[in-house]
């Protein structure tokens, strides 16, 4: 972390003596720059190109040094469009990596990869900045205590609980609800834990980023009247940005989260949507730098790049960063090198199912595919563990019986199997839940359900005490008491119709 004596623009540190070079070659977003002998910049240094294009428009492009080519040449990747750049333009070496503003000034604001505000709400206090390239915390600083991070979402807390300071992968194809689940988590964490969140939009749609910002303002996570009371900082590098920006925007978001953890000693939630786009941008840059591709055309440095990002996301004795990362799965193939490399770093996986989304069960979390290293009796306790296992057994049995049901019908099943199917269908519906951020779509007020209440509800269904209630009573409710109240209302409505 650096305290800047001046309030110079973010992204570039203030230096008295600056070395300068000239552009020798431009290949799309990659620049080759020639420097005088003995004045070469270091790897990862930020270079700034300032000048005017042929039309007289001002140019200000920041690049990051990636390779030293020899003969006093370096190869750098641009963080913004290189339109208008020409050979021979002056390039200034800032003498330090990209630095971005950190701390309370970032809350409620939207930044780009350079830490520049892009929300038209005026300048940001840049007296405190931090470089985006840092080493991971030392072993001695790490906190190894295992504790559950309660989200208030029943299916997550019961079947695939999140670890405080852990890394969670949100797997799903296009349009099954990854972003809605992320928005609900930001909302719940802000309200229930009072913690701050940092959202890194890596290579996703500009429209989604805009929708997220608007919904955060509506739900109060971003406070427009008093911006300092906001609970989230947003960092965007959308699909239309050059690959350099998409590759580094995750590090910008992580740097902001690290400050809240290390200096403010807070528990932080870091969202990365989408980690696959980080890999994809790295692959593009790797090809532009002339590296030989590896499996399926990915960069040969895939594991190293992923590791250098993921190892910085951890709990220390000062605070924790719990990270939730949306993982796009290309062609729904989990063996693709990008999702497969991500898997190795995760403590829990929340898998979203297109089949459940088609049934209208939201959140469409697959209860049998989602996993967590925290679901052990020694960590969550015997009651929670046994309830979760029985729920999974019931759902698994229902899945096995579905072929028989579709061919022969329910009547051909034994009495015991029919009971299992009835309970499984109730469980499946009870795993759905109305979200605060989806109130406008569902018309139902959002619900936050505590872990103890979640366990009690599923134990009652499994025990058979609620066998007499209709299964639609369990759909889109919070606690089990709401389900029984809904059943009574349904019964009253049917009596009135008679």
Curated annotation (Swiss-Prot):
InterPro entries membership: AAA+_ATPase, ATP-synt_VA_C, ATP_synth_F1_bsu, ATPase_a/bsu_AS, ATPase_alpha/beta_chains, ATPase_F1/V1/A1_a/bsu_N, ATPase_F1/V1/A1_a/bsu_N_sf, ATPase_F1/V1/A1_a/bsu_nucl-bd
Source superkingdom: Eukaryota
Keywords assigned by UniProt, alphabetized: ATP synthesis, ATP-binding, CF(1), Chloroplast, Hydrogen ion transport, Ion transport, Membrane, Nucleotide-binding, Plastid, Thylakoid, Translocase, Transport
Gene3D superfamilies per UniProt: 2.40.10.170, Bovine Mitochondrial F1-atpase, Atp Synthase Beta Chain, Chain D, domain 3, P-loop containing nucleotide triphosphate hydrolases
GO cellular component: chloroplast thylakoid membrane; mitochondrion; proton-transporting ATP synthase complex
EC number from the UniProt entry: 7.1.2.2
Protein's UniProt keywords contain Repeat: no
Family the UniProt entry places it in: Belongs to the ATPase alpha/beta chains family.
Function comment: Produces ATP from ADP in the presence of a proton gradient across the membrane. The catalytic sites are hosted primarily by the beta subunits.
Quaternary organization: F-type ATPases have 2 components, CF(1) - the catalytic core - and CF(0) - the membrane proton channel. CF(1) has five subunits: alpha(3), beta(3), gamma(1), delta(1), epsilon(1). CF(0) has four main subunits: a(1), b(1), b'(1) and c(9-12).
Protein name: ATP synthase subunit beta, chloroplastic
Organism in which the protein naturally occurs: Oenothera argillicola (Appalachian evening primrose)
Gene: atpB
């Amino acid at each position: 972390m650096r305290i800047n004596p001046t309030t110079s623009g973010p992204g570039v540190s203030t230096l008295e003596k600056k070395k300068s070079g000239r552009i020798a070659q431009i290949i799309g977003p990659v620049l080759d720059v020639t420097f005088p002998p003995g004045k070469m910049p270091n790897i990862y240094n930020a270079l700034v190109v300032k000048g005017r294009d042929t039309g007289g428009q001002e140019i200000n492009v920041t690049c990051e040094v990636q390779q030293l080519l020899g003969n006093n040449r370096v190869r750098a990747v641009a963080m913004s469009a290189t339109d208008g750049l020409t050979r021979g333009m002056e390039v200034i070496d800032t003498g330090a990596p990209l630095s971005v503003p950190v701390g309370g000034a970032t809350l409620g604001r939207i930044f780009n990869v350079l830490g520049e505000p892009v929300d038209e709400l005026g300048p940001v206090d840049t007296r405190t900045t931090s470089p985006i390239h840092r080493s991971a915390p030392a072993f001695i600083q790490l906190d190894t205590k295992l504790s559950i991070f309660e989200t208030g979402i029943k299916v997550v807390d019961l079947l695939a609980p999140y670890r405080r300071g852990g890394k969670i992968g949100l797997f799903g194809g296009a349009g099954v609800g990854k972003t809605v689940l992320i928005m609900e988590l930001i909302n719940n964490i802000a309200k229930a834990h009072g913690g701050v969140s940092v959202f890194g939009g890596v290579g996703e749609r500009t429209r989604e980023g805009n929708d997220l910002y608007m919904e955060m303002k509506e739900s109060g996570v971003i406070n427009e009247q008093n911006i300092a009371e906001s609970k989230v900082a947003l960092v965007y590098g959308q699909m239309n940005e050059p690959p350099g920006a998409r590759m580094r925007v995750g590090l910008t978001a992580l740097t902001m989260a690290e400050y809240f953890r290390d200096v403010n000693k807070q528990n932080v939630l870091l969202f990365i949507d989408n980690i696959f786009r980080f890999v994809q941008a790295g692959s593009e840059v790797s090809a532009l730098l002339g590296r030989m591709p590896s499996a399926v055309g990915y960069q040969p440095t895939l594991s190293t790049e992923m590791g250098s990002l993921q190892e910085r996301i951890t709990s220390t004795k000062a605070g924790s960063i719990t990270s939730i990362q949306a993982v796009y799965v290309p062609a729904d193939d989990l063996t693709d090198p990008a999702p497969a490399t991500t898997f190795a770093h995760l403590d829990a996986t929340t898998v979203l199912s297109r089949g459940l989304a088609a049934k209208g069960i939201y959140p469409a979390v697959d209860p049998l595919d989602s996993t967590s290293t925290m679901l052990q009796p020694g960590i969550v306790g015997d009651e929670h563990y046994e309830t979760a296992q029985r729920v999974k057994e019931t759902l698994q049995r229902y899945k096995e019986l579905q072929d028989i049901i579709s061919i022969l019908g329910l009547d051909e099943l034994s009495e015991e199997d029919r009971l299992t199917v009835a309970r499984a269908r109730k469980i499946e519906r009870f795993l759905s839940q109305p979200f605060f951020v989806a109130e406008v779509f569902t018309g139902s007020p959002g619900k936050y359900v505590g872990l103890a209440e979640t366990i009690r509800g599923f134990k009652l269904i499994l025990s058979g005490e609620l066998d007499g209630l209709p299964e639609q009573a369990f759909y889109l409710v919070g606690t089990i008491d709401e389900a029984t109240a809904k059943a009574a209302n349904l019964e009253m409505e049917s009596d009135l119709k008679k």
